[in-house]
């Protein structure tokens, strides 16, 4: 049987000198006994996997509302894809796979129902009810709030008491004075963008909201077609899957190669040196960065702002606004634990935390119960699967 010490020794012997080692973790906010058989980052990963917040990701929107079809990505499938990409690249670069996976599994825990539409609504509502701008709503900040406080699983501390390395990896935007994060955290940021670019193109084609003819205006797509022998614009289901697989492989290869070159050029020899640098080292090649930038603009214009998606966004916004104002007007409708939290944090924050934890399905059911004359909420029916 391998002990924790054995696993830590294996890391020291096999990982790159710039990787983050479990044995060199800066610890946790609340001291606790180490596991005899798991590294510190293994404990983090396992704790995240067993949270209710993680399970709820299955029924939260990525782009398409969960009720619109069984085959579209959800926040859970997106999270798993990010974890797979992060582990794959970490293995090749000699980084700590387990730390990268832990950060990946937690990175979207703070997303509310209905994706970014839900985030915008909660942020706006919090501001309207007097919450300072720095404390309104952001899904990255909410992820940290979940793992440091809201998940109530242990008697000795609030939250999950994750290592400081995993928590730092969730500090995606608010890094004033902190410098770049670990290479593992940088990798998760890149894997996140990689995964949603590839699967949003795939889901857009599957749904019929994007067409092969539209995509042929996109430089990334034209280069992809040059790599894969398919007969565009008449794409079969197998063609679409082949293109998605090839795109993932191409992006991962570019990310791995460019990052390895950047690390080598900087000559870093420790994780501490990485954190002292002014720039990030996990990166794409310059041509790929330009292709991805153009693709992001294309997706924003043709998928995220498609009239059917915009209709879904408006439906979600009205639903969440109705729930929030109803709970604010009549707090007695809230569960007891939410009312108890309101005494500590104020009613708007408690409602925000409660609603951010809802799934698409639960929020829709609460709305139907609150406004029974509205009938079942229709999300424009199923899109093409």
UniProtKB/Swiss-Prot annotation:
Keyword Transmembrane tagged: no
Disulfide links within the chain: none
Pfam families, A to Z: HD, HD_assoc
Record GO biological process: dGTP catabolic process
A single GO molecular function term of this UniProt record: dGTPase activity
Domain of life: Bacteria
Domain annotation HD: ranges: 75-197
SUPFAM superfamilies assigned to the protein according to its UniProt record, in alphabetical order: HD-domain/PDEase-like
InterPro entries found in the cross-reference section: dGTPase, dGTPase-like, dNTPase_2, HD/PDEase_dom, HD_domain, PHydrolase_assoc_dom
Gene3D superfamilies: Hypothetical protein af1432 (1.10.3210.10)
Keywords of this entry: Hydrolase
UniProt family annotation: Belongs to the dGTPase family. Type 2 subfamily.
Protein's recorded name: Deoxyguanosinetriphosphate triphosphohydrolase-like protein
